[in-house]
A protein has these predicted regions:
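N-terminal non-catalytic cap/leader segment that marks the start of a structured domain
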Residues: 1-79, 172, 182, 186-187, ...
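Catalytic-pocket segment enriched in acidic/His residues
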Residues: 48, 52, 68, 74, ...
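Residue-level recognition of short, solvent-exposed, well-ordered loop/turn junctions
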Residues: 54, 60, 91, 106-108, ...
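Structural signature of FAD isoalloxazine-binding scaffolds in flavoprotein oxidoreductases
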Residues: 75-92, 107, 237-241
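Short, structured patches in soluble enzyme cores that scaffold and shape functional sites
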Residues: 84, 109-111, 115-117, 135-140, ...
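A structural-propensity feature for long, helix-poor, extended segments
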Residues: 92-112
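N-terminal accessory regions of nucleic-acid-interacting proteins
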Residues: 120-136
Length: 253
């Protein structure tokens, strides 16, 4: 099932929907409990897709991919995690806004995992039971604010620095998913989730050991080699086979 949030005809009202083919059907209820698909539907080309979720928390993992053909190192005892506030979240086609003190930032195409139910100190074997689904993320970072000893949050926390979308797929198999990123049409990232160092089930278990994960929380699972800098006027497309394309342009605020 492909879950989305959308608006229609420029109205402020936000609808929840299930995408089926070229249409999106509205639904009632909560994706974390039970939904009922309603008769009302819209053509996809008539609506504006929004971020498919407004998470309470966004947790990212850094340095979690190896280049294809490289020897994969063992999973680190202490993975690099960072935090993004919900004010970083935007949806498909929304602008990434650089504040006056940022002139360039890196894009990072990633698979994002959406948590489906409260998870506290769960085991890796239990992790799949706590996943609602997957979506695409662009984990934007202003590297000039990264601390040399690994403090990343400041550079990751600017408003609009976490595009998500276009939808959450509740049945997506992320294990071998291919991740691609194009900057102004030029392909700069192309790899698969097979190159991940800390597996997703281990990631979820580890995080749930030091903080309770809530329904709707988002985990950014890392990005392959090739991430590069983008500047005002650029367009970045993050593509995951089976999850669609997340496209955003960059503007100077």
């Amino acid at each position: 099932m492909k879950l989305a949030r959308f608006s229609f005809e420029g109205k402020a009202e936000v609808y929840n929907g299930v995408i089926e083919g070229d249409f999106i059907h509205t639904y009632s209820g909560s994706p974390f409990e039970q939904i009922e698909i309603l008769q009302e539907k819209y053509a996809l080309h008539e609506v504006k897709l929004l971020s498919p979720i407004i998470p309470r928390h966004i947790i990212g993992i850094g340095k979690n991919f190896v280049a294809e053909g490289s020897i994969k190192p063992p999973m680190p005892e202490l993975p690099i995690f960072f935090y993004k506030p919900l004010t970083t979240v935007i949806g498909p086609d929304d602008p990434i806004l650089f504040p006056s003190n940022v002139t360039e930032a890196k894009f990072e195409a990633e698979v994002a995992i959406v948590i489906g139910k409260t998870a506290q100190a769960i085991t890796p074997d239990e992790a799949s039971n706590y996943i609602l689904g997957s979506t695409i993320a662009n984990d934007v970072g202003a590297f000039q604010f990264f601390h040399e000893e690994g403090h990343w949050t400041v550079g990751k926390a600017f408003d609009t620095f976490c595009p998500l979308g276009p939808y959450i797929d509740t049945e997506f198999d992320y294990n071998n998913a291919r991740i691609i990123a194009r900057l102004n049409g030029k392909e700069l990232q192309n790899s698969t989730m097979e190159q991940i160092i800390t597996p997703i089930h281990e990631m979820i278990s580890y995080i749930s050991g030091f903080m309770t994960l809530m329904p709707g929380d988002v985990i950014l699972t890392g990005t392959p080699a090739g991430a590069d800098f983008m500047r005002a006027g650029d367009t970045i497309e993050c593509i995951v086979d089976g999850l669609g394309t997340l496209s955003n342009t960059v503007q100077q605020r």
